[in-house]
Amino acid sequence: VKIVLNTSPIIFLSKVNSLKLLADCIDDIYAPKAVIQELHEYTLPAFIKVRPLSATGEAYVQGALGRLHQGELEAIVLAQEIAVDYVVLDDLLARLKAQRLGLDVMGTLGLLLFLEKRSVLNAEQAWQKIQQLTEQHSMYLSPQLLQQIKIQLLGNIFNTDTQH
């Protein structure tokens, strides 16, 4: 599996001590230069390869700046240029743009579920990390999505509704 990361997934995964786990199940992990510049106090692990864009890609990013940040645009362009399996973006507009361009998109939540699917995390650990992100680190997920993920990971044992 080959991915390009945007800034927010790197930050969110770092906050729940999961960034380093990606190396256990993803072959090639890339980030564009703009993402590295946006990280400020975060140190990028050596397994994340920083790749510059082509001159054409740079020109596209400069012309497209506006509703999306430079890091998001560079991640999308880099994903196209090096033909990755997923571009990892959390921002809805960035995800929609990437999908319109034919890219497969995953977010931080998807990466945590991928880690669980690959048995790098167990279901309970994955759920705890998702809870930490939503309760302590300002990641917004709708209550409906949280419930779906909880059931997917932990089963229906927490459902307190009873039918009569």
What are these regions (language model features)?
Residues L78, L111, K129-Q132:
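A general alpha-helix detector
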